[in-house]
């Protein structure tokens, strides 16, 4: 009996050196405020506008997590996307969803809660939990349909 991975190698060639990128999308809702305590209210309002609202504001965030690796010869997967989703949910979504980024999120403590700083913080939450052979390639974090950041760990 011919094993399917052997059959695929026979028909398609060996893909051990092929880099494939896989993206999983997750969502969370969170509130925050952009406000520099060293500045006056007027300066904060001038720089951050409505985002400096003293009563906070919120977003429906969309997070794309892109990993890269070689497809497993037996499964064809770079990594099981259900397992990737579980890692994202445990180490990111549960910490952020329906939270105040300024007050409730440990990895944002002492930082300006901009989308730029948030995407770096999310990266740092995910990297230690990915298995060997799976590399985090890119995070894309959408704050609104018109505003997003991309981070490649650089």
Question: PLM features: what roles do these ranges have?
Answer:
Residues 2-154:
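Charge-rich, low-complexity N-terminal segments
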């Amino acid at each position: 009996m011919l094993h399917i991975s052997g059959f695929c190698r026979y028909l398609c060639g060996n893909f051990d050196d092929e880099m494939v990128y896989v993206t999983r999308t997750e969502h969370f809702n969170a509130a925050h405020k952009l406000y520099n305590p060293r500045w006056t209210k007027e300066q904060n309002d001038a720089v951050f506008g409505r985002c400096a609202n003293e009563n906070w504001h919120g977003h429906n965030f969309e997070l794309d997590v892109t990993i890269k690796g070689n497809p497993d010869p037996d499964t064809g997967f770079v990594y099981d996307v259900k397992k990737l989703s579980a890692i994202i949910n445990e180490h990111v979504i549960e910490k952020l969803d329906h939270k105040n980024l300024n007050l409730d999120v440990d990895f944002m403590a002492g930082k300006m809660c901009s989308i730029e700083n948030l995407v770096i913080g999310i990266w740092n939450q995910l990297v230690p939990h990915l298995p060997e052979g799976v590399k985090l390639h890119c995070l894309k974090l959408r704050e609104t349909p018109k505003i997003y950041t991309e981070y490649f760990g650089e």
